[in-house]
Swiss-Prot record:
This is N-acetyl-gamma-glutamyl-phosphate reductase. InterPro entries: AGPR_AS, AGPR_type-1, NAD(P)-bd_dom_sf, NAGSA_dehydrogenase, Semialdehyde_DH_NAD-bd. It comes from Methanococcus aeolicus (strain ATCC BAA-1280 / DSM 17508 / OCM 812 / Nankai-3). The gene is argC. PROSITE patterns: ARGC (PS01224). One of its GO terms (molecular function) is NADP+ binding. Keywords: Amino-acid biosynthesis, Arginine biosynthesis, Cytoplasm, NADP, Oxidoreductase. It catalyses: N-acetyl-L-glutamate 5-semialdehyde + phosphate + NADP(+) = N-acetyl-L-glutamyl 5-phosphate + NADPH + H(+).
Amino acid sequence: MVTISIIGGTGYTGSELLRILLNHPQVEIKHITSRKMDGVNITKVHPNLKNIKNIDNLVFENISPSNLDSDFVFCATPHGASMKIVPELYETGSKIIDLSGDYRFEDLSLYEKWYNLTHTGELPAVYGLPELHRNEIKKAQLVANPGCFPTGSILALAPLVKEGIIENRIIVDSKTGVSGAGVNPSETTHYPSVNENILPYKMTTHRHSPEIEKELEKLNISNNIKLSFTPHLAPLTRGILSTTHSYLKNTDIDRDIIIDIYNEFYKNEPFVRIFEEGAPTLTGVRGSNFCDIGGFEIDRHGRIVVVSAIDNLVKGASGQAIHNLNLMAGFNETESLLYGGLKP
């Protein structure tokens, strides 16, 4: 049994952390922090959690990070806020899972360039994608939870990059639900703007681009990945469907070989499902911690199309964070996470 606290429990990722952790048999929820909601009952903000275990007795607290006194702390805070909190937590000896982008880059200058923020300083962090960094995560004190777009994109492309069978120029086209924009509404996420519409945004400048590039490059040092990434906001609440395009170096490689490569690469991964026929769907993963991968179509020019589907709030955020918790704590890594998508 471990004690956990959540810093920033009022947003969507905080809500999902609570929803999943309330069914985790090895976890005791100790503190859930919020400055604005100090003293307010958790179920006032998250009524979907009412009557689940002891949640009705918990309130949000405005409490200093150094006073959380927990084995694990989830930082569900905005980019730029975590780096002001994490150093203090790190000194207490708590293990930390940060859901912001603040510790995802080994090169802080890259973070500062793409996030337009000055970083407070480097700490030893492990990139929290279990399928690629499981052993490092188990030993880490600080884990940087991956971004939602990078999660689906990296998992879709990793076997091809690792094998060294594709050219270094890659295109990723992603469609995402509006929950990825966070709990605070904007003109872009306003219902009349997004309903029956698809909105491309940050078409060449999205800050997840270098995160995808750098992680893929670690898989094969001979690769200097040149990624073109364009996200689109779709009239969905949850989910990211990423269609990846790359070119095979050897056009003699056929679809069966590609599928064998993916099955071998992910054969021991509990949350990656390979679809040998057709493409994955968002309804198949909604509400779950799965990443479904399929497509594997090759055109006459040697272009290979691989598609991934994830729930941006679960596998793309809170579910993956809890997967990391399980690894760091030595629990069964699927604990509280092994359930199917909400289809239909």
